[in-house]
């Protein structure tokens, strides 16, 4: 993905996810991507000790929290962090930005019962308030077929994809990744021009 132009890759460390990777696999990945881009570690309601044990073995640049973690919890690791916000019609993004003012970004993701992201479903992009997009990473149901429209409408700082570039759960498809990255880059260029 990084060789194709992605800015970051993510490893899921939440044991309840079908996309979770072991510490050994993540350490191997980190050696392969060193210097190419950011490596992000995804956690869901895990203890500080669990997060730290990953950091002791895997050189993550950024942490991504998808559960009910507080700002104080997220900050304690002295790394940039992204806080996922499950999107529904009643989410107040101004309040979320204030509650996680130390976050590098807020990742806006769709809500699906019993899942913490990776559902493959979009949320209504009109819920993203104008002027709050500079620290927003848009996620939730994105693929090469809709990422350009998403970027054009929301104008987020970045986009995040998982299921939209998979052959099957946890297995990425190179052609889908390439198409997604090309569509995202083209849409971002159109906005800049």
What are these regions (language model features)?
Residues 6-17, 65-70, 112, 153-178:
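Glycine-rich phosphate-binding active-site loops on the catalytic face of alpha/beta enzymes
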Residues 23-32, 74-76, 162-193:
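C-terminal helical cap(s) of enzyme catalytic domains, especially alpha/beta-barrels
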Residues 3-6, 33:
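A short, Lys/Arg-enriched amphipathic alpha-helix followed by its capping loop at the start of a domain
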Residues 135, 139-146, 151-164, 177-185:
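C-terminal active-site rim and adjoining tail of enzyme catalytic domains
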Residues 1, 63, 106, 161, ...:
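Residue-level signal for inorganic ion chemistry
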Residues 10-17, 21, 25-138, 142-146:
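Conserved anion-binding
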């Amino acid at each position: 993905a990084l060789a194709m132009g992605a800015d970051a890759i993510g490893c899921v460390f939440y044991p309840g996810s079908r996309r979770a990777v072991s510490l050994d696999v993540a350490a191997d990945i980190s050696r392969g991507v060193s210097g190419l881009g950011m490596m992000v570690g995804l956690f869901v309601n895990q203890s500080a000790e669990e997060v730290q044990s990953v950091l002791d073995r895997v050189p993550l640049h950024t942490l991504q929290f998808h559960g009910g973690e507080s700002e104080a919890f997220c900050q304690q690791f002295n790394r940039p962090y992204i806080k996922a916000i499950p999107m529904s019609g009643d989410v107040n993004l101004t309040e979320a930005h204030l509650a996680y003012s130390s976050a590098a970004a807020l990742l806006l993701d769709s809500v699906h019962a019993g899942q913490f992201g990776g559902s493959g479903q979009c949320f209504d992009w009109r819920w993203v308030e104008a002027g709050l997009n500079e620290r927003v990473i848009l996620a939730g149901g994105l693929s090469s077929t809709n990422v350009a429209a998403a970027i054009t409408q929301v104008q987020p700082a970045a986009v995040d994809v998982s299921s939209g570039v998979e052959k099957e759960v946890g297995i990425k498809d190179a052609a889908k990744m390439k198409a997604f990255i090309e569509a995202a880059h083209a849409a971002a260029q159109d906005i800049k021009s």
